[in-house]
Amino acid sequence: MGSKQPYLNGAYYGPSIPPPPKAHRSYNSPGFGCCCFSCLGSCLRCCGCCILSLICNILIAVAVILGVAALILWLIFRPNAVKFYVADANLNRFSFDPNNNLHYSLDLNFTIRNPNQRVGVYYDEFSVSGYYGDQRFGSANVSSFYQGHKNTTVILTKIEGQNLVVLGDGARTDLKDDEKSGIYRINAKLRLSVRFKFWFIKSWKLKPKIKCDDLKIPLGSSNSTGGFKFQPVQCDFDLS
């Protein structure tokens, strides 16, 4: 018979298990390096966002300040409307051929009066269009220029060429009357892009509407005008 096992009093769980060795964290491990770079990248992104936000806030503040300053100067000076006149006009040719092509040669001389004492005007775009009835037949461009305060500027324009112009029944009737009298009723419109200057501050671009209607211009080659001469006309100025 085999040898007897010694008597065990109570439960027996086997030999004790030693605790696992403590893990030592290495600060040179790849995991720790990635954490550092990740934190650094987050800080840089955060700083970049803060800088961009600061720049945007500064630009907005500057724009608001300039806008308020321009408004204050506008309210102080209360600029008067610039006045436009057709001072003289010469119609050298105005005739239709059988194909409804209008042959024209029109000289329009404008006088522009800036009545303001402290406000100058930049004319960035300046074009003149001639109309017969409601049909535009030609145009001319003027080079950009600056008009000082309390200044009168004379602009000479020439609208010349040929163009297809189809007139309605009413305009055809008017044309027959004009050909008979030798005096033609022509309208002119000015297309402008202007900026006002208050001291060192310039306004935003404005596009006023200038209409010079019902210009009665004698045809130069006509002998039926009875000595009629062109009379200066003030144009309508609309800044709305």
Curated annotation (Swiss-Prot):
It is found in: Cell membrane. GO terms for biological process: defense response to virus. It is a single-pass membrane protein. InterPro entries: LEA_2, NDR1-like. GO terms for cellular component: chloroplast; plasma membrane; plasmodesma. Keywords: Cell membrane, Glycoprotein, Membrane, Plant defense, Transmembrane, Transmembrane helix. Pfam families: LEA_2. The chain crosses the membrane at residues 57-77. It comes from the Eukaryota. Its main location: membrane. Induction: Induced by spermine and infection with the cucumber mosaic virus (CMV-Y and CMV-B2 strains). Glycans are attached at N109, N141, N151, N223. Expressed at low levels in roots, rosette leaves, cauline leaves, stems, flowers and siliques. Plants over-expressing NHL2 develop leaf necrotic lesions surrounded by chlorosis. May play a role in plant immunity. This is NDR1/HIN1-like protein 2. It comes from Arabidopsis thaliana. The lineage of its organism: Eukaryota, Viridiplantae, Streptophyta, Embryophyta, Tracheophyta.
